[in-house]
């Protein structure tokens, strides 16, 4: 099966959906598919160009098209790239903000229709629309309504043969507007490194004042970690109060660590440091290599997810934590669409409730796992099934 994966940006390490798409293409290639990549709206290139991108031990042909170029020129270049070796499927990895700064993709279907032509289209909806969380502002709800209309219009115009989304809450939102989507939860973007060395981490923690005291065993310290973006609306309460209570009873010190780009959470991090700095130690490690992130996830005790419980299936950061066998706390529960975020609850995921102080001392790591291979197998099985249904029609 020949698949061209279409996304907005393929700058390694700068675009989460692009990184996911590259990994999925590589995994499909390792399972016998012919995979290629197209970035249709890439802000990191100034001119169109082809290159070979490496991921998970595979080399993949990629075409990157600059966001500044006219749509007509980008579509012509992408069509020429595809015509050299016709694909069985185009897989559009859609996130509305990749195409427009406010996520309003009105008219996108008209641009993409000539590219798709008579090829079978798969659509992965990584994001839908905003305004569904409790307490959403009027501005969020209005913008979300525009985004919803644009997504529905896109699907109506392009008529994909197969649609996936990452969590049951999104599937329910789509079902409410008459769109049926299968679930394809995300995998982690960080490969598990066997025998990872954590010497660099211990040195950094000493320099940043977050290491345990020299005479204290590691078992007397709990390390909680954020990975990636910290949304400005994320609240440390009541999580940090629960952690403090559990740590006092268990006679543990607590370190709160962050790795990766923190994004819009700069001010929130400073506020947490000022408010809780007497009770917990804090350390920001910044952007690191995948191998260092893997060693970090293997060296801490608990992950903290910043995605709401019902949307947890769309979080690549949470998926990376779970892939590393890390118990993950999910404090946010401000989205209520009437569906859990995963088809099957993961025993390593802990929804934050008042029992958290009792759960923390009992939590244990799981075994590392390779969710990418299973994801690729499920993806290809689903589109093969959709393709057979399409032929039968």
Which functions belong to the PLM regions below?
Residues 7-12, 26-84, 170, 261-266:
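N-terminal strand-loop element at the rim of the active site
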Residues 7-22, 45, 98-103, 232-236, ...:
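A short, glycine/small-residue-rich beta-strand->loop->alpha-helix junction that serves as a flexible
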Residues 110-117, 141-162:
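Membrane-proximal helix-turn-helix segments that form the acceptor-binding/catalytic region
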Residues 122, 130-154, 169, 190, ...:
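Nucleotide-sugar donor phosphate/pyrophosphate-binding loop at the beta->alpha transition
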Residues 132, 152-183, 188-195, 267:
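A short, active-site helix/loop in glycosyltransferases that binds the activated sugar's phosphate group
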Residues 205-235, 257:
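Conserved donor-binding/catalytic core segment of Leloir-type glycosyltransferases
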Residues 258-260, 267-291:
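Nucleotide-activated donor-binding/catalytic signature segment of Leloir-type glycosyltransferases, i.e.
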Residues 297-312:
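Acidic donor-binding loop of glycosyltransferase active sites
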